[in-house]
Amino acid sequence: MLTRRDYLKLSALTGAASLLPSSLLAAFDADQLITRAIPKSGEDLPIVGLGSSATFRKVAQSEDVSALTDVIKTLLDNGGTVLDTAPSYGAAEEVSGEIGHDTGLTDRIFWATKVNAVPRGSGDPADPDKVNAQLERSFKVLRKEPLDLIQVHNLADLPTQMGAIRELKEEGRIRYIGTTSTNPRRYPELEQAMKDYPIDFIGVDYAVDNRTAAERILPLAEDLGIATLIYVPFGRSRLFSRTSGMDVPEWALEFGSTSWV
């Protein structure tokens, strides 16, 4: 469970604790799980989830994935549910699906995966057959239907790929759909997609040293009732690199923190 102390540790670098609404602070004090509602449905999700594009992906490509099993179990044991992955994350999607199946935890996970069958760097339209094949593979390796969320990765060929996942949602095979962009230069395209398509989620990068999404994307998402997945909230390792070798400030001891990590 994410408690007040845990969240303050996560927020120490961002100053976010001073901006929290009173309802959220009250939840911390009561040691309640901190959640946010998906605007389109009202379904609550814990505010902290698990990504799989970096360290998770590297370990997934190794022979011993027991550490990943422990990570997923720890997430679920503490009330988390969201696991974000993608076919392009090496073995991450397949291995996380195997772990969920082998441990009997598949149905406890909110699976968020992606689709992008556009040839890398080509700018060509996606082949509809390849789009459908990639989607069917995600159903197969994650072993859950309906899948909770599938997003078009990096705004790639939205007419083709958004069309495909919209059809699957209408068929009841996907619960939520969306799109992602981690490139601020493409945020105007993301804004337009948010207005043009009936999406439930977007995914963007946001960290204390990367707040571009807060200028237009996050306010627009709020206005349109679109849920947001935040990627790399610590800038991968940037924030920890900047504090390497620095003493933890005295005020951090007030919530039991003795390390920047």
Residue ranges and their predicted role:
Residues 1-109:
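N-terminal binding-site loop/beta-alpha segment at the start of enzyme catalytic domains
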Residues 5, 155-261:
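Beta/alpha (TIM)-barrel catalytic core signal, keyed to glycine-rich beta->alpha loops juxtaposed to Asp/Glu
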Residues 47-49, 82, 108-112, 146-149, ...:
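Structural preference for beta-strand elements that scaffold enzyme active sites
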Residues 107-121, 150-153:
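A short, structured active-site edge motif that brings together acidic residues
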Residues 54-65, 115-128, 254:
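Active-site mouth loops of central-metabolism enzymes
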Residues 62-74, 126-140, 184-192:
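Short, acidic/polar
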Residues 130-151, 171:
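CE4/NodB-like, metal-dependent polysaccharide N-deacetylase domain
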Residues 58-59, 86-94, 118-125, 153-160, ...:
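Acidic-and-aromatic substrate-binding clefts and catalytic sites of carbohydrate-active enzymes
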